Amino acid sequence: HYGRTHKREIMTEELKELLQECDTLKARLVALRPLPAEALKKIDEAFAVEYTYESNRIEGNTLTLQETELVVNEGVTIAGKSMREHLEAINHREAIDYIKDFAKNDIEISEGTIKEIHALVLHGINRENAGRYRTVPVMISGSQHIPPQPYLIEEQMEDFTRRYKEMEKEKVHPVLIAAYRHDTL
């Protein structure tokens, strides 16, 4: 597995083909540029709402996709839903916008920026832990994944950011970098 073995990269033919397909699709998208501003806005909105919905759903948020859209784009409150669920949707959307600003301005993702994103996601929900490493062990119900012990987190985050920089320097395919980041975080 790429992220945990660091220097060992397993590149199967199937993976090479999938990465080539990604490159082909990206080239087709680039060829369509510049996309009309209205089309870009619609794509951006649809992505942000669906990503917010799916991320929060995994964490137990009960807002539907349509309710998530109303909360983040229209500022509507949904009867019978908790303030926490509303804040989770709003904060996630804010975090997406924050990350997009990083990409536009070519700002390096660091431990500090990851903590800032974490603080945005937990804003108004969990002040004590927002933007900080956790200090207690946790379990994820229904998952076989065992999160690291609190005393290991800082070291693992340092390793994560170091490895991410190495992968960028080595010109590792962006899809593999994204997979590493998703799997590791």
Spans of features found by a protein language model:
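FIC/Doc superfamily catalytic core
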Residues: H1-L185
